Design a protein with these regions (language model features):
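Glycine-rich dinucleotide-binding loop and its adjacent helix/turn
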Residues: 2-5, 73-82, 88, 92, ...
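Glycine-rich active-site loop/strand segments that organize a redox cofactor
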Residues: 47, 56-95
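Active-site acidic short loop of glycosyltransferases
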Residues: 13-16, 138-140, 165
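N-terminal Rossmann-like FAD-binding beta1-loop-alpha1 element of flavoenzymes
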Residues: 16-44
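Feature captures the FAD/FMN-dependent oxidoreductase FAD-binding
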Residues: 84-150
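Short helix-loop-beta connector
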Residues: 12-15, 178-180
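Glycine-rich FAD pyrophosphate-binding loop
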Residues: 35-60
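Basic/polar N-terminal segments that are highly enriched at the extreme N-terminus
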Residues: 1-14
Length: 180
């Protein structure tokens, strides 16, 4: 079965031309540009269950971009109607979702696929990409598009064990927790 047929069936392809790690701004942009170049033999490996990267993860109250909103869009997919100069996470994430749909990227994404490692084999000129599930796929090109913020870092604060409240990272906001 070809990689395209396997991808359409939702299975993880065993071999692709390009393996992209991460379905945030970077990984999705690369996928769009590959499609525009006529390259369809690729897969996006996303550890979570939705696209969006930082803007999927950081859903804390008041989260918004720290640069003007129009800079948080692809140059080829402008958004002139941002609701405010510094858009909130919901609007930015919706832009990512809308762009994903517009360019038909979902069939290329494999959600829940954590990459544990990759090795390049000089003889075959291919990457072996190892997934947490135990599966391995082969790729001619391997692109890390995870971004610097995909793993929350809780600092080691002296006395934290004595704190009586709940401790959680802003990238793993607990919306059920009452802060009042």
């Amino acid at each position: 079965m070809s990689a395209v047929l396997e991808r359409d069936a939702g299975a993880l392809p065993r071999q692709v031309e390009v393996a992209i790690v991460g379905a945030g701004f970077g990984g999705l942009c690369l996928a769009i540009k590959l499609l525009e170049a006529g390259i369809r033999d690729f897969v996006i490996l996303e550890k979570d269950q939705e696209v969006g990267g930082t803007w999927r993860d950081n859903q804390y109250p008041g989260a918004e971009c720290d640069v003007q909103s129009h800079l948080y869009s692809y140059s080829f997919e402008g958004k002139p109607d941002w609701s405010q100069r510094y858009a909130g996470w919901e609007e930015i994430h919706q832009y990512i979702l809308d762009t994903t749909e517009k360019y038909g990227l979902r069939p290329y994404i494999r959600f829940g696929q954590q990459v544990d490692g990759a090795q390049f084999d000089v003889k075959s000129a291919r990457w072996s990409v190892h997934l947490r599930s135990g599966e391995t796929l082969q790729a001619r090109h391997f692109v890390m598009a995870t971004g610097p913020l995909h793993v929350p870092n809780l600092p080691d604060i002296q006395g934290l064990a004595r704190f009586k409240g709940k401790v959680f990272h802003s990238a793993r906001w607990d919306h059920s927790y009452d802060l009042t």
